[in-house]
Amino acid sequence: MPYSEIRGVPGVPAQAVLGFLAQLTQQVAPVGIVLVAQRASGSLALAGAAAAAFSVGAGMGRPVQGRLMDRRGSRPVLAATALIHVAALLALVGWAQAGGAWWAMAVLSWVAGIGLPPISLSMRIEWGRRIGAEGHTAAYSLVYLVQELAMLVGPLAFGLLIAVASSSLALGLVAVAAGAGTLAFSLALRAGATASSRGRGRVFTDRRMLVLLAVVLLLGGVIGALQVGLPALAAARGAPAATGLLVAALSLGGIAGAAAYGARSWGFRVQARLAGLLLVLGLVLAPLVLVGALPLFWAVLFAGGLVLNPALTTASLLVDEYAPAAQAEAFGWISTSIGMGGAAGSAAAGVAGDLFGHSAPFLAAAAFALGGSALASTLLRTGRPGTV
């Protein structure tokens, strides 16, 4: 199913726009928390702990949110999380301005993470139910395209707000905008407005779901390793400002990859697609160890982004097959696995960089991708042919 047909489904264009607005804090919140907490406490370590608390909260919250969505529907979960998320961030800003204790900022950051609204999860559920199986590749690609755009635009808008105001005011404004977008998005839902009649199943009835989570964890490791490797490389080259351009290369590649991947039908089995995409990702990232010129580095990262988002899309397609009776919770576990993998990847990349130099994190990223490909290939032995 081409994108033109998906855009013709009533409500989808509005949901995509509102979903974009609602996800502005996805990337902004951790950065904003660091800036606000560091200014209040004077310690980067304490600010980092607050940001880590946000990430931990987000990882803990996703499966719970998904289970509630399976049982109660999307709207009440979105409304509740929007209020919790915005209230916690505004309380954090106020507490920091008042010079409150740092541990309370960490607690508020954790609460903000727990309440991070499950927008992309809701979009997958909504569009998956309203669009036939033949259109799921395009629908899930559009989900990641919208998310990637929000992750690209959000920090830029945040930076502009900081330039004209302050980090505290900027974080508060972005939080309010995201909260309003979430509430508007929840009202725009149609199929996801009520709980699915199937939504009381068990996530891990099919044990292949556990294998898929392990694959996605390794894919998250790729992302985490790159998050450490890119600023380290730019700093080592004496051009720390180039970090933004390198991150943008990966994001732009992800946008282009999601758009291209969803624009056509694929004849390969879904399991084979996932293994193949991760293999290509690993082979693309491995040469970064040898690349010297930053422009060439940018081009290789763009190529990596071209397959990164399609790999995430393909993992979502397998959720349709492995956990059809508890999709929202399963998607929540996918998000948690990506976050856990990101933490592991960041840690591994940091150790590799200290031991072997600033290029080593990219070898770690490639190793995560190749390991994910090998593990995904085991799904071929028991998997059924894909139908999307």
Task: Please place each PLM-identified region on the residue numbering.
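Helix-loop boundary and gating motifs at the non-cytosolic
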Residues: 2-57, 203-248
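Hydrophobic core of transmembrane alpha-helices in multi-pass small-molecule transporters
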Residues: 20, 102-118, 217, 297-310
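Intracellular juxtamembrane helix-capping segments at the cytosolic ends
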Residues: 33, 117-131, 230, 310-323
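Helix-to-loop junctions at the C-terminal end of transmembrane segments
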Residues: 61-74, 162, 256-270, 353
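C-terminal ends and interior cores of transmembrane alpha-helices
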Residues: 83-99, 280-292
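Cytoplasmic helix-loop-helix junction between adjacent transmembrane helices
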Residues: 108-149
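C-terminal transmembrane helical hairpin of 12-TM major facilitator-type secondary transporters
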Residues: 271-313
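A late C-terminal transmembrane helix in Major Facilitator Superfamily
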Residues: 326-356
